[in-house]
């Protein structure tokens, strides 16, 4: 059947949603973005980390120069432990040297503003369009919003975050298709074990530009990133007393946020600087539950997900937004190839199903590996139990370049737009640390390393005291 023009409806003017709009514009594919908020770039107190794999796509879209105006590249990280021991790592600088892009943070508001203002046709980004209903047709989807507007498209993309209405529609449709047990199992795996107070503070004496501080405590971690003009991006992650299953996860008011902050006011996170001093300098702040999961179901019919709507991770690895950016590039790559191969004809439902399954297959393993890294790191940084406590005190200080190597292996296989030129700024790390160049994943290597640690630790504790045994082991490796 001949069609006028294939159209993609993107629900959510998020980082991933707006990046997809840019990618589709470059690919020549008709699209529209429906954003429920009236402000395309609200200030909610959040920051965003742009790592080389996300930066590379933004550079392809000619947006990274604007990002660079608002960042202070990280060069050093300082890690502090409860007993007063601290050490430094130059892994941020190493990453910059390996990939040609730094690890950098900026206001999430500013990133959204860059994506929104940098888009060439604002009429395609519809604000104040909260989706109220989604109707799946044989050859498309029909979307109705609170304003009464009706949008018809050939593909619906849910870039609408962890509380995604598109994901609910996919679960509903899959359930009707008699996959109820699988959907219930998938939906129940979105869990919450941590909460995060996050915010942005003005410059403080003693916190140097381009540096990051990770203060590790039992059940708590405080992270600060010192950005452009001394602007401090920070988050405090705390272990909760119980495990919640979505959607029964806690929601927090501003009053509850203030109470939680006051409870840790006197905690020193760097030298003699207390969290209370950082809190008093805040420009904006909030508190949220940290959901965790990579869903197995990514699509149904003509509906598909990207970003936090399908994979939600804690902020510790800084890859959440970068994964959404990669999702956008991967989906745009496939849609462009489909458009070229289909010519003037619209692809059949089975062809669309094949394309969306291919998108899921291309992304799932990579996203899930980084998600597992996030699960490991958040528990490591809050010293969640004896193993993580031992690792933070007796493994991390002696790990050398291993943290940089681990990060490099998650960065190197990043997806970019295959129909746009590769950025000129680059480094040898993309090839050296790519999956093709290694036989084991870094998590496998880490598990083998930790298994060896366990055996040696057990043997040594028979002869030495605990601290002496661990120091002896790490001085030998």
From Swiss-Prot:
Its EC number is 1.-.-.-. One of its GO terms (biological process) is paxilline biosynthetic process. Keywords: FAD, Flavoprotein, Membrane, Monooxygenase, Oxidoreductase, Transmembrane, Transmembrane helix. The active site is at 195. Pathway: Secondary metabolite biosynthesis. One of its GO terms (molecular function) is FAD binding. Its main location: membrane. PANTHER family: FAD-BINDING DOMAIN-CONTAINING PROTEIN-RELATED, FAD-DEPENDENT MONOOXYGENASE ASQG-RELATED. This is FAD-dependent monooxygenase paxM.
């Amino acid at each position: 059947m001949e069609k006028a023009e294939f159209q993609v409806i993107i629900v959510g003017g998020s980082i991933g949603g707006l990046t997809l709009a840019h990618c589709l514009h470059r690919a020549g594919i008709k699209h529209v973005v429906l954003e429920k908020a009236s402000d395309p770039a609200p200030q909610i107190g959040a920051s965003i980390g742009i790592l080389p794999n996300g930066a590379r796509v933004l550079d392809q879209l000619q947006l990274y120069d604007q990002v660079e105006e608002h960042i202070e590249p990280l060069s050093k990280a300082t890690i502090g432990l409860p007993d007063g021991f601290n050490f430094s790592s130059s892994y941020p600088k190493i990453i910059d040297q390996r990939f040609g892009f730094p690890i950098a943070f900026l206001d999430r508001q500013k990133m959204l503003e860059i994506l929104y203002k940098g888009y060439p046709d604002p009429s395609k980004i519809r604000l104040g369009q909260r989706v109220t209903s989604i109707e799946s047709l044989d050859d498309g989807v029909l979307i109705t919003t609170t304003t009464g507007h009706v949008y018809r498209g050939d593909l619906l993309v849910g870039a609408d975050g962890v509380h995604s209405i598109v994901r609910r529609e996919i679960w509903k449709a899959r359930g009707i298709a008699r996959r109820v047990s699988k959907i219930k199992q998938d939906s129940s795996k979105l869990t919450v074990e941590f909460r995060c107070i996050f915010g942005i503070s003005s410059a403080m004496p003693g916190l140097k530009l381009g540096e990051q501080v990770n203060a590790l405590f039992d059940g708590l971690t405080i992270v600060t990133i010192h950005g452009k003009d001394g602007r401090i991006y920070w988050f405090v992650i705390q272990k909760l007393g119980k495990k919640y299953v979505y959607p029964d996860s806690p929601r927090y008011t501003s009053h509850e946020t203030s109470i939680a902050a006051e409870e840790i006011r006197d905690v020193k996170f760097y030298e003699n600087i207390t969290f209370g001093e950082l809190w008093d300098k805040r420009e904006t702040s909030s508190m949220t539950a940290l959901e965790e999961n990579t869903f197995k179901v990514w699509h149904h019919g003509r509906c598909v997900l990207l970003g936090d709507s399908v994979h939600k991770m804690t902020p510790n690895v800084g890859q959440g937004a970068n994964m959404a950016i990669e999702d956008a590039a991967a989906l745009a790559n496939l849609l462009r190839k489909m458009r070229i191969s289909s010519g003037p004809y619209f692809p059949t439902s089975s062809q669309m199903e094949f394309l969306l399954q291919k998108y899921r297959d291309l992304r799932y393993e990579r996203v899930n590996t980084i998600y597992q890294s996030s699960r490991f790191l958040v528990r490591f940084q809050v010293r969640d139990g004896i193993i993580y406590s031992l690792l933070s005190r007796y493994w991390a200080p002696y790990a050398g370049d291993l943290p940089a190597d681990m990060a490099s292996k998650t960065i190197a296989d990043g997806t970019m737009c295959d129909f746009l030129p590769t950025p000129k700024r680059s480094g040898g790390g993309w090839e050296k640390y790519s999956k093709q160049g290694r036989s084991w994943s870094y998590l496998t290597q880490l598990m083998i390393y930790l298994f060896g640690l366990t055996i040696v630790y057990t043997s040594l504790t028979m002869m030495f005291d605990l601290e002496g045994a661990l120091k002896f082991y790490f001085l030998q490796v």
